[in-house]
Regions:
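Hydrophobic ligand-binding cavity/cleft-lining segments
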Residues: 1-45
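A short, structured loop/turn motif at beta-sheet edges
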Residues: 15-19, 68-72, 90-95
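Beta-strand/loop substructures that line and gate deep hydrophobic ligand-binding cavities in soluble
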Residues: 74-131
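Glycine-rich portal/gate segments that line the openings of hydrophobic small-molecule binding cavities
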Residues: 13, 32-36, 40-83, 99, ...
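A general secondary-structure signal for short beta-strands and their flanking turns/coil
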Residues: 3-7, 51, 84, 93
Length: 131
């Protein structure tokens, strides 16, 4: 694998319920709405389950994801191809934590930061009452 070893752990506060955070991370239909510009392959199940393998692309870079752990407050993805490593998510009422480690030519810390900001914005918009 070409690239450098990178690792990053970030935790943010979000004005959202644990259930909304969980749905945003474990349901591919929700994940695709906020994790732009990353594109996921078609035909994903309603919810990420252990043992599932899927791919995403970020421009010309393809990333393979293997769902190692999928629990009510934790998601662990083993990554290969464009990133050789793992991505862990933990969450609770009002907070999300992301830990990313891997070898890649991509700037993982920057991507992780942008993803968390996008998730927070998505959750804020989702929780605005419709009039």
């Amino acid at each position: 694998m070409l690239g450098t070893f990178q690792h990053s752990s970030l935790r943010i506060e979000v004005n959202a319920k644990e259930a909304d955070i969980r749905d945003s991370l474990l349901r591919p239909s929700q994940l695709q709405k906020w994790l732009w510009p990353q594109q996921f392959n078609q035909g994903l199940p309603e919810q990420l389950q252990p043992g599932l393998t899927f791919t995403s692309s970020l421009g010309p870079v393809t990333i393979q994801h293997y769902v190692d752990v999928s629990q009510p407050n934790c998601l662990r993805l083993l990554l290969s191809q464009g990133i050789d490593g793992f991505h862990e998510w933990y969450w609770g009422e009002g907070w999300v934590q992301s830990r990313l480690e891997g070898i890649s030519i991509l700037p993982l810390n920057l991507g992780q930061t942008i993803s968390l900001i996008q998730l927070r914005e998505f959750l804020v918009k989702k929780n605005i009452p419709q009039t």
